[in-house]
């Protein structure tokens, strides 16, 4: 009996069990935090980085840093927005102010100058001229900022008039559409819903921006203003299930002869591209 007192005392197995539990807890916490980061806080800098499970299901928040055409722009992804520190802990890109603001006095209309003088003297195409002057007079507060880690966005469901490219002339209202989009989006934070990646590796997306009357769909607003047509392709068009709404507002704009529909002879962007 006396010899038993000299034997080493063994610790209960509960210590090893606690170590296992703590290891599982910390491993699970790390994996959960990593999954949360990848799902909600990871920044995407190009369309091909966006995971497939995001398309058609989730919205991404960010800032418009450049508008280069009437139906596309550059988007700086700011995942998590203000809650994730963007704008106060993590810097958002600062854009340089336009000085002076872009207006009809600085940016010429897509209508040739001799045609505009003729129209003003003889009173031809007054409706078209009025719409053109309105859009060309919209102020654009910021300049484009390039060379940033941004996603190139193609606005879904619509086609804006073609600007001058490779020596080809611009379509009427192409400059007006560009200025309206710059006036509406540049320097602002928007939500995008990725729908697809096109042949140019741009993210085709539904885009919404905030106004005093609520959130607006950029594509629908362009159609309502007569600055874009419903996208004509039957195979690659993306409407996020709202094609009927796009068609309705296009017919309404056409009936009111708004923007592009104020022309007597109108060639759609699709027809223009096929012709040239």
UniProtKB/Swiss-Prot annotation:
One of its GO terms (molecular function) is endonuclease activity. Pfam families: SNase. Gene3D superfamilies: 2.40.50.90. It is a single-pass membrane protein. It comes from Zygosaccharomyces rouxii (strain ATCC 2623 / CBS 732 / NBRC 1130 / NCYC 568 / NRRL Y-229). The keyword Membrane applies. Ca(2+) binds at residue 159. This is Probable endonuclease LCL3. Keywords: Calcium, Endonuclease, Hydrolase, Membrane, Metal-binding, Mitochondrion, Nuclease, Transmembrane, Transmembrane helix. It comes from the Eukaryota. The active site is at residues 154, 162, 202. Its main location: mitochondrion. GO terms for cellular component: membrane; mitochondrion. The chain crosses the membrane at residues 17-37. Residues 58-263 form the TNase-like domain. Its EC number is 3.1.-.-. Disulfide bonds: none annotated. It is found in: Mitochondrion; Membrane. InterPro entries: SNase_OB-fold_sf, Staphylococal_nuclease_OB-fold. Belongs to the LCL3 family. It is an enzyme of class 3 (hydrolase).
